[in-house]
Amino acid sequence: MWKYSNKIIYRNVSGNQLWFNRNSSVGGTLSQQTQLELADSRIDEKWQQARSFGEIPGPSLLRMLSFFMPGGALRNTNLIQMNRLMREMYGDIYCIPGMMGKPNAVFTYNPDDFEMTYRNEGVWPIRIGLESLNYYRKIHRPDVFKGVGGLASDQGQEWADIRNKVNPVLMKVQNVRQNLPQLDQISKEFIDKLETQRNPETHTLTTDFHNQLKMWAFESISFVALNTRMGLLSDNPDPNADRLAKHMRDFFNYSFQFDVQPSIWTFYKTAGFKKFLKTYDNITDITSNYIETAMRGFGKNDDGKTKCVLEQLLEHNKKVAVTMVMDMLMAGIDTTSSACLTILYHLARNPSKQEKLRRELLRILPTTKDSLTDQNTKNMPYLRACIKEGLRITSITPGNFRITPKDLVLSGYQVPRGTGVLMGVLELSNDDKYFAQSSEFIPERWLKSDLAPDIQACPAARTRNPFVYLPFGFGPRTCIGKRIAELEIETLLVRLLRSYKVSWLPETPIEYESTIILSPCGDIRFKLEPVGDLM
């Protein structure tokens, strides 16, 4: 269960303790950490005037459980639907009681609460999520991970030590953009493969487009992480890569089952949890083999090649390097492919916006044989606006989560330290209060200036509050893969929409299923009509 004192915060998970010691330091000095007083709170006048924690609206434990029973209000809903229904029932702030060892969780849809939470998260933000992953790495397989849980599951100084090592490699723009030539080549190969699978008469694909996107994403992230080509876009793909993609689908489903939904696995290892451990064993074995193979090739005939993430991190710490690259291979498939598919869907449903974007792309690439460079990709304002707008309407995560390290007042209620806070960003991104005509795909709302007579900036159509739109999170725990994902998405969309006019074929909107992310599912079919070169 969760415990909190004035010295430590931890959760005991079958002998595994996540420590947040006030006497430790992170990315700075002890005095800096002490000044923030992660485990202390100041009882001020605002706190004394606030309503009590017990007055926050919300269901009882039994009521909450009934929602997921057959016939319950939240039965068979995805995370988008669940947030919307609960907000309709309880308003812009409500509390879900803790269960199965998890803390109470306050859900808020107030951007002022978002800012309050982020501004008080300290230098060691506490984001509990993948506890099953932490158990696997630190308790089940310490032989492989040597005490390193990774950025997704470690907390406190352990998390900070890892983050400080990987930030210069993964968050520095120029360090990431040096991968552009190869990522462009991978995207061109993806287009070539689509062409072999496209019916020339109906312009439809004969294969699963979403699965093909996953193969592109895997090929891209494996190059960035390992400087390795898997051959997934060729006629002879690596069979282990296909196996890994399948195991990753299972992993995302299991993580949702054991880390998001109520589960007894922390008290009793169920048959389903043992299947999860086996799935993760398979993932670990495959990724370990890829890493070992890549390491054997380092230093041989480099000829000035760009160092991949693994090679750069090995210069600092082998344990961190291996774990970080495993995380990249795991997280870089479904997340990036789902985001790409979502943005493409919105552009396919809005042909006039797509045509405006294509004019920009034709300027960048007059012919499909031209290459993407740092120079010609500097000025792509409409593409980047389209990406922002697509992720505004449908972010692959509905919100951001933190454990409060100090007492806070949110929406006029006392929220004691140690409470979980879920900030429902996606709900606000689809609220007319913050985005005019929020259900409409309007990239122009993100432009700073007019681009053409028919592409005029309308920043008034979006809120000026910076805490409403946060697809990659905020603060020290901003998504570590943000720079890589942005580059991959931009490169793929440039190539795809420069080559084809894309239309959405199903009569119904795209559907999403909940794993630990929102993933497109159901009937996913596009029409791809070739676009010629400029004469």
Swiss-Prot record:
GO terms for cellular component: mitochondrial membrane. Its EC number is 1.14.-.-. It comes from the Eukaryota. Its cofactor is heme. CDD domains: CYP24A1-like. GO terms for molecular function: heme binding; iron ion binding; monooxygenase activity; oxidoreductase activity, acting on paired donors, with incorporation or reduction of molecular oxygen. InterPro entries: CYP11_CYP27_families (IPR050479), Cyt_P450 (IPR001128), Cyt_P450_CS (IPR017972), Cyt_P450_E_grp-I (IPR002401), Cyt_P450_sf (IPR036396). Heme binds at residue 479. Keywords: Heme, Iron, Membrane, Metal-binding, Mitochondrion, Monooxygenase, Oxidoreductase, Transit peptide. Pfam families: p450 (PF00067). It is found in: Mitochondrion membrane. Belongs to the cytochrome P450 family. This is Probable cytochrome P450 12b2, mitochondrial. The lineage of its organism: Eukaryota, Metazoa, Ecdysozoa, Arthropoda, Hexapoda. The gene is Cyp12b2.
